[in-house]
């Protein structure tokens, strides 16, 4: 073996050994990198997974039947105007964290939709430095007053984020099949005809499906609904 070949072989061995952890720097010579501070929140214009809505997006007030259905199901929080989420038109219901909500507005911490930033925030711990902004709300669930089949499809698709209410505005009492299907899928069913008070027919699952796990996408939807709440002038109740 030539001197050059020997040098290359030695270099390869040392590199492999370093990768295998055979050679390590003494404790005194190690340098622990200082963690970077959380990124400042910036309103993102686009996100392929959770697309932002336009700043000039229009909205209509929440229908009385939908608001009454949330009350009949004893859901806490604020019903927001209808919004398209993952291709489904629903009325989101959120429970504001009033203290965080007001703190973020006072600090100018706008809703954040960038998933890489949210992944960074969600994994941050107190020992790394000042905590990034907390979520201003919790997703309670979603209401749909669409035709029963479409309503069930929408709230089932969004089941990883929260519960769901099928709002039946028909004059006739809900059918056996609809009652059975809501009971089977864990959806709430509220009958809200135009000439009678809203009535809870099926009490469904509270919260997301039991297999759901919190991810940066979960936080992304919380941030989007925070943005939608601000856009539609929703406010948390004042203390006292």
Give, region by region, the residue ranges found by the protein language model.
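Hydrophobic beta-strand segments of well-ordered beta-sheets in folded domains
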Residues: 140-142, 158-168, 187-188
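Generic structural signal of hydrophobic/aromatic residues within well-ordered alpha-helices
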Residues: 66, 70, 121, 221, ...
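Nuclease-adjacent, charged terminal/linker segments that flank catalytic cores
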Residues: 1-102, 111-113, 231-240
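Active-site-adjacent loop/helix micro-motif of nuclease/hydrolase catalytic cores
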Residues: 147-155, 169, 174-177
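Non-catalytic C-terminal interaction segments of nucleic acid-processing enzymes
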Residues: 125-131, 171-172, 179-240
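Conserved catalytic cores of phosphodiester-cleaving nucleases, focusing on short active-site segments
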Residues: 87-123, 128-130, 135-148, 157
